[in-house]
Each structure stands twice: as C-alpha cells, then as structure tokens.
C-alpha cells in the first residue's frame, strides 16, 4: 500500500541561528549577513539621514512605545497632580494649661522684673599721679635722650568698617531698660561747607525756570476759511462800535471801546448797520498789517439760529477797518521806451548795422559801398584792389519788429598784394555778419549733408594715393 507524502513545509532556522553557524564557513545566504550586521539599504538611509535630521526625544523608530518625553495622555482624562500636604498652623511656643480654679486675669506686672539687657562698657579713667619726681645731682655731664618717633597712618581701603549692632528687642509690661553702644567710629573725612560769592543784584541772574505769565502770543486766526470777512467803512467802528450794533443812550451808558462787548439776543431789534445784525459778542480790537495797510480788526460772533435745547448757531465774522496805507520804500524810477513804435518809418543809412573793417595800409581814395534793397553801386580804385570799408546793410523785417542798433564788429585783414594791372574782384573779400531782426534760412541749408561711407582698406594689397 502506497503511503501519502506529507505536504507540510519545514521551517527554516532564524537569521540569528544561521549567522552563528554559517559565518565561519562562509556559506550564509545573501540576506542574512546584512540583516544581522545592520548593513541593509534601510539601515544605511537611517544612518546617513540622521546626520542632518534630529528626532531625539520623540521615540520615532525606537520601538519603545513610550510616546516621547511626555508620554501618552488619554484624551478623556487629565494627568494626576500631586497635592501638597496641609500643615496645621500651631503657635510657636507651648501654652501652659489653665485649670478650672485658676483666675481668669493674669497679672504680668507682679511677676515681671527689671530686664537687664546689657551693662554699658566700662569707661577707663586715667590714673591719678602726684606729679613728677625731681632729683638733683651734682653731675654736670649732659644727658643723652634716645627719642624715637613713630608715625602710623591708617588706609581706609584696607580697614574694616565698624558695624553698629542693633539693640536687642524686648517686650514686657514692666519697666524696660535698654543699653547698647551707640558710638561708632568712621574713617571718612569731614569737610566744612564754605559759602561762595553771593550776588545781591537780582537783575543779572538768569534762571532756567520759565517766568510765569510770559508766553508766546497766539495766532488770532482772522483769515481762516471758517471766518467771514466784512470790511467796515464807517469810522465810528474805531471809537464807538456799539452804535453800529444797537441803539443806546450816551447819557446813561458809557462803554470802553477797547474791551470785549457782549449783547443780549437782538433778533427782534434792527441794527443801525445791517452788517452787524444778530451780533451777540464783539471781541477786543487788534492792530495788524495786511497788504501795505494798518488794519483795525475785531472778531464777532453771530446768533443766527437758536434750538429748543438752548444751543445757538451762528457765524464767526472778522470786521476790519483799514486806517492808512503804507507806501513802499524807495524812489520811483521813470521807465523809458526801449523800442520804437511799429508805425515809425525807418530811414536808410541811419547808422544801424555798421560793420567796420580796419586795414593796415592807407589809401588815397577809399571806395564806399552802399547796399540798398533796390540798387547796389560798386566803385573800385584804379591803383589798388578792392578795399573793404564801412558797409551799411539795412535789414527789413517781415513782421514789423522794432529794430535796435547792434554793436560794431571790427574785422582785421592781411595786406593785399598790388598787381601791375588793375584787377577787379568778382566777389567781396570780407564776410559781412548782420545781427538784428528776423531772417529766413536759405533752402539749400535745409538739406543735410550726406556722410560718405568710409571703407577700411586694411585687408587690401594695393596702396591708395592721397
């Protein structure tokens, strides 16, 4: 009969058991040695990665399951706290028991005696002597005395300071006598206070404390945007401003115009001046300077509207009266016209635009050239060539602009060679510059000159003639 083969697989030994037997023989599988010696890929990642990342105290990868430094805390409960043991309060001294027959009032004066805290230190008394003994001898030899002087100086830096002990505390209902030494020695130097020079003149004394009552004058705010500006023409505003606000009887009322004036509700009255209607307060005057004038100003408050609660609403008005004007300093200078009128006609050869050309030689009969818009006349000498002289060029402006005389420009020239036969020049040898008025540029100057393209002959083998 054929027996059934067992299909159960035999378990292999663990890696630790295999490593102990196969390490010496060198027959260990490839996965046993790295696992036991911790040289797997995962171990190498943890080894080199721990150099840059630190997870100390968190319990990651340790397998201990402690939950880190603080441990695991259940969500539903709180960690228990240790309560301190309560210590009963007891008196510091023992209390004697009191019997039922003992009196309730204890007399402390009878039992208490005189408490001697301490006896004072004895004061040494100098010894009493009867004097010096005088002995007389017949020896005439002079006596030699050996005298040595010793001086001692105490350094307070290295001397211990004297400490004054506090008195001993004591409490009793009888007689109390305290005795302690209250005399102490010190090593510091006592310097008497001296009186410096005392000045009796209080006018020259300067103090850093500000003088009360002297302050910087505040700005009046007369020309703010919220203030209405009203100019007063009536000169009564200077002496009796109350007459412009309400009717008064001068026989019974005397008002100082330099003080603030307050009025009751004058809405049912008509003011003599309509500019002062509904005025309830007119403040003190002020003299100011505004735009070369001396100005007399007063601020006033109006009561235009009154609410049921008693609040008043009104504008703030600045009343001013210009007393006099201030003339600007300096003498006035009469201005002279610089140019002629556009309707003035100009004459030819009136001295405008004269250009002088100085020569180094003298001629007998110089030639004169007069150039005009209509004709041009030229004359030359029969002996010498063309000699430039004063040339007058009247320039006409197309926009009737006044023409002013320009400066004289001297031009120097080299001496001209004299030929054996007369030579009439075709063009003048002197450049004439004209300044003044307006001009038109010649159309040929509008075209820009075309720059010649330069070609480099560095790589050529031929020479170019200059």
Swiss-Prot record:
DNA-binding listed as a keyword: yes
Post-translational modification: Highly phosphorylated.
Keywords: Capsid protein, Cytoplasmic inwards viral transport, Disulfide bond, DNA-binding, Host endosome, Host Golgi apparatus, Host nucleus, Host-virus interaction, Late protein, Microtubular inwards viral transport, Phosphoprotein, Viral penetration into host nucleus, Virion, Virus entry into host cell
Cysteine pairs bridged by disulfides in the record: 22-28
InterPro entries hit by this protein: Late_L2 (IPR000784)
Intervals of motif Nuclear localization signal: 1-13, 447-455
Top-level division of the source organism's lineage: Viruses
Coiled-coil positions: none
GO molecular function: DNA binding; structural molecule activity
GO cellular component assignments: host cell; host cell endosome; host cell Golgi apparatus; host cell nucleus; viral capsid
GO biological process: microtubule-dependent intracellular transport of viral material towards nucleus; symbiont entry into host cell; viral penetration into host nucleus
Quaternary structure and partners: Interacts with major capsid protein L1. Interacts with E2; this interaction inhibits E2 transcriptional activity but not the DNA replication function E2. Interacts with host GADD45GIP1. Interacts with host HSPA8; this interaction is required for L2 nuclear translocation. Interacts with host importins KPNB2 and KPNB3. Forms a complex with importin alpha2-beta1 heterodimers via interaction with the importin alpha2 adapter. Interacts with host DYNLT1; this interaction is essential for virus intracellular transport during entry.
Family membership: Belongs to the papillomaviridae L2 protein family.
Protein name from the UniProt record: Minor capsid protein L2
Natural source organism: Human papillomavirus 31
């Amino acid at each position: 009969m054929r027996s059934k083969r067992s299909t159960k697989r035999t378990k292999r030994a663990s890696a630790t058991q295999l490593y102990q037997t196969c390490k010496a023989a060198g027959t260990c599988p490839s996965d046993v040695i790295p696992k036991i010696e911790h040289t797997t890929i995962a171990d190498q990642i943890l080894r080199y990665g721990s150099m840059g990342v630190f997870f100390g105290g968190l319990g990651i990868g340790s397998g201990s399951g402690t939950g880190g430094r603080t441990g695991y805390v259940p969500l539903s409960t709180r960690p228990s706290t240790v309560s301190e043991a309560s210590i009963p309060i007891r008196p510091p001294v023992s209390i004697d028991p009191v019997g039922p027959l003992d009196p309730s009032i204890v007399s402390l004066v009878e039992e208490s005696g005189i408490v001697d805290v301490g006896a004072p230190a004895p004061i040494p008394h100098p010894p009493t002597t009867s004097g010096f003994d005088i002995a007389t001898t017949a020896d005439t030899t002079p006596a030699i005395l050996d005298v040595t002087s010793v001086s001692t100086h105490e350094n307070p830096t290295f001397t211990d300071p004297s400490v004054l002990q506090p008195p001993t505390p004591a409490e009793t209902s009888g007689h109390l006598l305290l005795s302690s030494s209250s005399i102490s020695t010190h090593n510091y130097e006592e310097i008497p206070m001296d009186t410096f020079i005392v000045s009796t003149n209080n006018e020259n004394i300067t103090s850093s404390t500000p003088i009360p009552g002297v302050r910087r004058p505040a700005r009046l705010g007369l020309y703010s945007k919220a203030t209405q500006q009203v100019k007063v023409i009536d000169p009564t505003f200077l002496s009796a401003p109350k007459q412009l606000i309400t009717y008064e009887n001068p026989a019974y009322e005397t008002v100082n115009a330099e003080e603030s004036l307050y009025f009751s509700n004058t809405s049912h009255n008509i003011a003599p001046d309509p500019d002062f209607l509904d005025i309830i307060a007119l403040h003190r005057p002020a003299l100011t300077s505004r735009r070369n004038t001396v100005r007399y100003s007063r601020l006033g408050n109006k009561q235009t509207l009154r609410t049921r609660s008693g609040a008043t609403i009104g504008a703030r008005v600045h009343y001013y009266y210009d007393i006099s004007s201030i003339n600007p300093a300096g003498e006035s200078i009469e201005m002279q016209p610089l140019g002629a009128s556009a309707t003035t006609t100009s004459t030819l050869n009136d001295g405008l635009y004269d250009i002088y050309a100085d020569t180094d030689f003298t001629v007998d009969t110089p030639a004169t050239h007069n150039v005009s818009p209509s004709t041009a006349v030229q004359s030359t000498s029969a002996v010498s060539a063309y000699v430039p002289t004063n040339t007058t060029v009247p320039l006409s402006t197309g926009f009737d602009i006044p023409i002013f005389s320009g400066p004289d420009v001297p031009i120097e020239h080299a001496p001209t060679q004299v030929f054996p036969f007369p030579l009439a020049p075709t063009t003048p040898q002197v450049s004439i510059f004209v300044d003044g008025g307006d001009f038109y540029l010649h159309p040929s100057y509008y075209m820009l000159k075309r720059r010649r393209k330069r070609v480099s002959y560095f790589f050529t083998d031929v020479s170019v003639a200059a």
